[in-house]
From Swiss-Prot:
Gene: COX3
A Pfam family assignment: COX3
CDD domains, per database record: Cyt_c_Oxidase_III
UniProt keyword list: Membrane, Mitochondrion, Mitochondrion inner membrane, Translocase, Transmembrane, Transmembrane helix
Name under which the protein is recorded: Cytochrome c oxidase subunit 3
Membrane topology classification: Multi-pass membrane protein
Domain of life: Eukaryota
GO cellular component annotations of the record: mitochondrial inner membrane
Source organism of this protein record: Allomyces macrogynus
The reaction(s) this protein catalyses: 4 Fe(II)-[cytochrome c] + O2 + 8 H(+)(in) = 4 Fe(III)-[cytochrome c] + 2 H2O + 4 H(+)(out)
Amino acid sequence: MTKKLINQFKSFQVHPYHLVEPSPWPLGASVACLILTLGGVMKFHGFAAGDIGLPLGLILVLASMLLWWRDVIREATYQGHHTKTVKYGITLGVVLFIVSEILLFFSLFWAFFHSSLAPSVELGSTWPPVGIEPLNPFEVPLLNTIILLTSGCTITVSHAKIISGDRGATILYLILTILLAWMFLGLQWVEYVNAPFTIADSVYGSTFFVATGFHGLHVMIGTIFLTVSLNRILSYHLTSGHHLGYEAAIWYWHVVDVIWLFLYVSVYYWGSNV
């Protein structure tokens, strides 16, 4: 009897950490990234193999991501591996990820102000450079600012509703946030298509399109995060006390909002010299 109890005790986990089972996805994702990189290099250098390697690598990377994250969802939702200790580690990882994103945009702002505060002679010693017609900050950029700030409000309401257990309102305000995000991206695309300058037009065009383009990319990533959260809410994966992934997506979205405010004030408003 004692031996049986000892064997049963050994089958229980006596620590709060998640010891991940062997998984093929780290190796699969590494190989997929290698194929994607090689395919991209061959494509850029005109090799015919790049026409196959680049899309194949992209498909394999996306497949590895989806299958890996599927397993993470299973471990958290169905197997109960995400204890308080595990969630603390995930939270710390998300915070460090967001800090790294902030530092990325810090470098982009540094490049912008380095070029604009003391314009070189080649630029005409003025900012915007001679020959550049900047965008009117009170047209599409201002509308996009209002849209993004509104999305920050709707996602905050959605977060409050999931905490209070109002599932219907949570879904409604989350859908509104996603729609506002797509409106922002659509208007950003219209702005790019109709811009009177290109990325090749001096350092002004370079800093403008790189900074706003990277922000647009992060809006797309945040929209994907929110869409996945919506799918998980519809699938009854998230509850009022268990929605760390959704909270992480909301933190990310608020950071994207704040970065846009800095972009609007510095690049669109101050940088246009209105």
